[in-house]
Amino acid sequence: MITKIQFKGYEGEMVPSEVTGAERLRYNREAPFTKEVDYYNNFVATGKVEIPKAYILPQAWWEVRELLELNGVEMTAFEKDTVIAAQVYRIEDFKTSSSAYEGHYLHSDTRVSASMKKVIIRKGDLLISTDQPAIRYLLETLEPEAVDSFFNWNFFDSILQQKEHFSPYVFEDVALRLLEENPDLEDAFEARKDSLPEFRSSWYAQLDWIHKNSRHYEPTHMRYPVFRLPR
């Protein structure tokens, strides 16, 4: 819905700069105006997310915990180790700024995928209900695709580093055995080679793909560490 408002201002004009000699913009205080302009008092969502019943924050992320506490977020610590079925995000894509802002190289255009998995919860990890006054803050910071999320502000950057890799001369035999023992994996592998010429021409990309689709691939790489409990 668009409404109209009366906007008051001053006419702009281009005048020679006394510093550079080039043209510069100056608002003429002797030429006030009042104009009717469009006022866009609504918005169209470019993305949406279903609000979970709660989030789970592992206690290792103490900096995030401190910021949540400073903003009045209510949290409850788990009293014992347990296993919970939770929605887990995986970081699929993001961009990173080439220049710093407030001491951070911010991420943007973050995209995630979601799946239900059983996750290990340790005593002391934090359960954060969304049924509280700080719900807006929680959504803006704990949802990684949100513009000002903790992920986009680099608080979870350690998940972006793959710490375990393979040695090609060793993994060649392992990769062959994996394909022989997993027909579905082999079918997906052959289909990928058929559809992607650049993949077909790169032996390393092929071994890397097999590695990342095997039990040898570290599960925490690119896995967003804050879990969601669906309603």
Predicted feature descriptions by range:
Residues 23-26, 99-110, 167, 181-186, ...:
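Flexible coil/linker segments and helix-coil junctions enriched in charged and small residues
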Residues 1-86, 90:
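Hard-cation-handling environments
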Residues 43, 48, 65-136, 142-147:
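Substrate-recognition/cap regions that form aromatic- and gly/pro-loop-enriched pockets
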Residues 3-33, 114-127, 157, 162-165, ...:
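Hydrophobic transmembrane alpha-helix bundles
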Residues 134-137, 142-231:
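Accessory, solvent-exposed terminal regions and/or long lumenal/extracellular loops of proteins
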Residues 33-36, 104-108, 163, 207:
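A short linear-motif detector with a strong N-terminal bias
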Residues 27-31, 43-45, 114-116, 173, ...:
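Short, flexible coil/linker segments at or flanking structured domains
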Residues 10, 27, 39-40, 55, ...:
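Sequence-level detector for tyrosine residue identity
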